[in-house]
Curated annotation (Swiss-Prot):
InterPro entries according to UniProt: NA-bd_OB-fold (IPR012340), Rib_uL2_dom2 (IPR014722), Ribosomal_uL2 (IPR002171), Ribosomal_uL2_arc_euk (IPR023672), Ribosomal_uL2_C (IPR022669), Ribosomal_uL2_dom3 (IPR014726), Translation_prot_SH3-like_sf (IPR008991)
One cellular component (GO) term of this entry: cytosolic large ribosomal subunit
Family in the record: Belongs to the universal ribosomal protein uL2 family.
Entry protein name: Large ribosomal subunit protein uL2
Keyword Ribonucleoprotein among record annotations: yes
A GO term, aspect molecular function: rRNA binding
Gene3D superfamilies found in the cross-reference section: 2.30.30.30, Nucleic acid-binding proteins, Ribosomal protein L2, domain 3
SMART domains hit by this protein: Ribosomal_L2 (SM01383), Ribosomal_L2_C (SM01382)
GO biological processes: cytoplasmic translation
Function comment: One of the primary rRNA binding proteins. Required for association of the 30S and 50S subunits to form the 70S ribosome, for tRNA binding and peptide bond formation. It has been suggested to have peptidyltransferase activity; this is somewhat controversial. Makes several contacts with the 16S rRNA in the 70S ribosome.
Region Disordered, residue ranges: 195-233
Basic residues: bias regions: 219-233
Amino acid sequence: MGKHIIPQRRGHGSLVYRSPSHRHITEVKHVDQGTYVIKDIIHAPGRNAPLLELMGSDGKKAYQIAFTGAFVGQNIVAGNVDSVSPGTTTVLANIPDGSYVYNIESSPGDGGEFCRSAGTFALVVSHGQHVTLKLPSGRMRDFDPRCRATLGVVAASGIKDPPILKAGTHVHYLRSKAKRPYTVRGVAMNAVNHPHGGGNHQHVGRPSTVGRNAPPGRKVGRLSPKRRRVNGR
């Protein structure tokens, strides 16, 4: 009898594949309307961008994804305002064309889903019935004008520039994100461990395409691929 492949083990939810949520500081969403002061810039396990520890005018503590140029003691504003200074959180309808924004809501009130990792930002292209943004992938996407976003660019844009010189450092980095630190090819395994394993030399030995509705133990390789088009046909 064959053994469970990695996606099946991950779906079972053991401690190896479970996110270490006990190390996470908090779930970072948009802050409530008001004026805040940056008290500290802290590292957040599981994230590649730092967090801003904010203190509101009402004395409540809040957290926000840090932006480039933030400093301790800086005042930032959140709400339905027309300010264009970095760190301001407001609705897309108030943000002028050509501005850089991050932590963009997909639907009004969800707290932010787009452009949250280090160094990312989106460009406000145009306003109309919808607000058009150019995402880091180059894709143009329309958003509801009531969706909120924060002006600026996410901090720590150069976090991936220095090389990771030690394998152990990379292991700890990926484990904080509940990711496997290494990948073993299926053709390099034994037949008991993977559908592509076994044989006198490394080869799949059968068509590597599988259907979209294949059972989990067989769903490896090229998943429901589309026929390659030649000359647009």
